[in-house]
Amino acid sequence: MKKKMSKLNARVHDFSMFKGNHIPRSKIHIPHKTIRAFNVGEIIPIYQTPVYPGEHIKMDLTSLYRPSTFIVPPMDDLIVDTYAFAVPWRIVWKDLEKFFGENSDSWDVKNAPPVPDIVAPSGGWDYGTLADHFGITPKVPGIRVKSLRFRAYAKIINDWFRDQNLSSECALTLDSSNSQGSNGSNQVTDIQLGGKPYIANKYHDYFTSCLPAPQKGAPTTLNVGGMAPVTTKFRDVPNLSGTPLIFRDNKGRTIKTGQLGIGPVDAGFLVAQNTAQAANGERAIPSNLWADLSNATGISISDLRLAITYQHYKEMDARGGTRYVEFTLNHFGVHTADARLQRSEFLGGHSQSLLVQSVPQTSSTVEKMTPQGNLAAFSETMIQNNYLVNKTFTEHSYIIVLAVVRYKHTYQQGIEADWFRGQDKFDMYDPLLANISEQPVKNREIMVQGNSQDNEIFGFQEAWADLRFKPNSVAGVMRSSHPQSLDYWHFADHYAQLPKLSSEWLKEDYKNVDRTLALKASDNTPQLRVDFMFNTIAEKPMPLYSTPGLRRI
């Protein structure tokens, strides 16, 4: 009898449950080829696609990079970085839940806002803009498309590429308002409007990772105590010739003697005498105030320990970053998943140097008198990214794949810090001094000029970092300043004026590469031509074919 009752109870209907639907899925092969041309430093979207809840994506990428022909084989490397990200719609559009019917009131369902639009600028988007790279036909005015992909790109930049110490965030609208597109190159306002691509920052090295200050925030200070009495002392005037008081104007000039009378306000400064005589026995009080610290309260060991901890806290924030994902990692050693922090999610990536092939000349040239064996160069590099993406998605998102080409920088105008070290023994490294605060990097280390600016501070770096880093260098005729310079053999920096630690200086510079190419970006010829081939296997919550029929009315 008990067994029968238990079976009966097991079959009781639960009104709080909804069975839902079993959605069949289909495995679909989606190849995609795209050919692009761009310059060094530009972060280019090379692939974008929407994904839906329950969709699984496995993506491989094969790339063929062909830079412009080099004048000679360069002695530096161009490095390709490829990144794949997922950006949920909800983190770039706050009304997503309302769009799909979520209501904050009772049964009534209010009109849901549509996905926000962006309208092409006057004359349409230009060639080479983000809109162009995302697949929108350029130079067509009046185009009206949905804006979430541009917002997603801006979100990725803010989360992963922006230097938070020097650069402002890209503007990012989250509401349902429509926007007007742009062809501009402003790195703050024009990114979410489909303007020019964001320029990546240089790779981190001794100079590019410098901090604006030793700590993030005001330096922690130690107060001597609460209050101290101020004591005054008198000084006897020795004789009648003493002149303890002299009248001067606001520029330090002695005020003229004369008689003040009725006149205009701008008549000048006048007094009867320019000094005041003292009499015997009188006392003057010039610059006579100081604190008597014998009665001041001192700082306790607990307060000292707390102040040191505050300073450590601020130094950790400066060096490790203060995005929340960075804070939890630096302070607690916990790497929080991107999805938990409403961030764009990094799915995978790859980094590889481009190969350069030398081409020796086999016959002389009459016009330029170049001999046989004269070298030129070209690059044709195949890059294979297996499993660039392999993920199941649980919400509406965009997959966006980005590519950028950069190089490691060589410096030719500075002098290493150790050449100036040795004023005293505390200027030299000692294990006891290993963990002192961030130390200044002087201007002379990146560009020496032989003037007072050499000793000014360029930025701050961890103590003794110059002993752990050796900057790449050139010399002799390889220097860009040489009258017969051969700087087309390398990508070394050469500054016309003293660089400043700033967002503008931190951006990757395509011009160093331009001087090594036969066809230059300055002549409106993109430095790189790339053939991208995406091989995607998608398991989608949809049939393999959509066949219409009366049974599905």
Curated annotation (Swiss-Prot):
Keyword field: Capsid protein, Host cytoplasm, T=1 icosahedral capsid protein, Virion
Q: Does the keyword Kinase apply?
A: no
Name its cellular compartments: Virion; Host cytoplasm
Q: Which GO terms describe its molecular function?
A: structural molecule activity
| Cystines in this chain | none
Q: Which domain of life is it from?
A: Viruses
Name the UniProt record assigns to this protein: Capsid protein VP1
Originating organism: Spiroplasma virus 4 (SpV4)
